Amino acid sequence: DWDAIRGAAVAALEHAYVPYSGYPVGAAALVDDGRIVSGCNVENASYGVTLCAECTMVGDLQMTGGGKLVAFMCINRDAETIMPCGRCRQLLYEHSAEGMTRDTVAGIRTIDQVLPNAFGPRDLEAVASRED
């Protein structure tokens, strides 16, 4: 339900801490058990430790029971769909169900289309299973 995911992202955006950029971001995702998790960006004077909205959303995922993300979106202050940075694409891949969909500036895409040829947990599991 993209409308419910967008609504959660809009609500999360309201909690963004952005005193430096003034660019709030909200993120939300549907989890494989039906929950919706969300997050907002949290800036820091030491820019390198700023948390993207996807990072706090994954924290919400883990704090509320874990699981795998099946559908995801992030938005700006105007509720326009925006793309995650490279680090966050990798973070999303780590916590995604196979084939996770996401709303992008080019329409609905899978995680594999947004981060092609990614390396993640499934690769490590494949190596471990060959060693057994």
Question: Each predicted region: which residue ranges?
Answer:
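C-terminal binding/interaction regions
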Residues: 1-15, 64-132
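Short, well-ordered amphipathic alpha-helical segments that serve as non-catalytic structural scaffolds
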Residues: 8-11, 53-61
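Short Gly/Pro-enriched turn/cap motifs at secondary-structure boundaries
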Residues: 17-20
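Compact, glycine-rich, soluble single-domain proteins
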Residues: 41-55
